[in-house]
From Swiss-Prot:
PANTHER family: 50S RIBOSOMAL PROTEIN L3, LARGE RIBOSOMAL SUBUNIT PROTEIN UL3C. It comes from Lactobacillus helveticus (strain DPC 4571). GO terms for biological process: translation. The gene is rplC. This is Large ribosomal subunit protein uL3. Gene3D superfamilies: 3.30.160.810, Translation factors. One of the primary rRNA binding proteins, it binds directly near the 3'-end of the 23S rRNA, where it nucleates assembly of the 50S subunit. Part of the 50S ribosomal subunit. Forms a cluster with proteins L14 and L19.
Length: 212
């Protein structure tokens, strides 16, 4: 069954394995999540557990948010997400989910929001090659031809625009270390997002054997 937790990306560091191998890891702080709601087929049409992470100031919360949090006997949360495919009997509204839900060697998927780069051109956004800089060329960093026949821009044409700030999931990452007393997960490799961005860590649905 699926397990999941919400957390915050702290940054990257390096640790040594038991075999003395230096491994780059991302440090994820996941203080205890509160189970805000348990959704069932009878009441909602599907099964899921709704988790809440990081307290939100009440002055910034509206009445529906406060009422929803009151049912779980907790304060309003800043980051709320659902985890599907879980064993519902293991969760109760108001209970907590901690990092020791996972163990070292677990394979997980991590979902976050990619870093924003603002408005960028084709070369940075799509990796397009530039044109010649000299010998009379007038094609340097522009997008290129839009087509010679149709009188419109084709759908999906790679053009300049806003880069980043999109939902990204990286699959089959390995948990190298669990530090339960500090509410920290150390995940091998990098995860989406900037420092202090909010992420979702859950069991990989297409897990492959961990490469140790």
């Amino acid at each position: 069954m699926t397990k999941g937790i919400l957390g915050r990306k702290v940054g990257m560091t390096q640790i040594f394995t038991k075999d003395g191998v230096l491994v780059p890891v991302t440090v994820v702080e996941a203080t205890p999540n509160v189970v805000m709601q348990v959704k069932t087929v009878e009441s909602d049409g599907y099964e899921a557990v709704q988790l809440g992470y990081q307290d939100k100031r009440e002055v910034l919360s509206n009445k529906p948010e406060k009422g929803h949090a009151d049912k779980a006997k907790t304060s309003p949360k800043r980051f709320i997400r659902e985890i599907r495919g879980v064993e519902l009997k293991d969760y109760e509204v108001g209970s907590e989910v901690t990092v020791d839900t996972f163990k070292e060697g677990d394979v997980v998927n991590v979902t976050g929001t990619s870093r924003g780069h603002g408005y960028q051109g084709n070369i940075k956004r799509w990796g397009q090659s530039r044109g010649p800089e000299t010998h009379g060329s007038r094609y340097h960093r522009i997008p290129g031809s839009m087509g010679s026949i149709i009188n419109r821009v084709p759908k999906g044409k790679r053009l300049p625009g806003h880069m980043g700030m999109k939902k990204v999931t990286i699959e089959n990452l390995v948990i190298e270390k669990v530090v339960a007393d500090k509410n920290v997960l150390m995940i091998k490799g990098n995860v989406p997002g900037a420092k202090n961005s909010l992420i979702v860590v859950k069991t990989a649905s297409k897990a492959v054997k961990a490469d140790k």
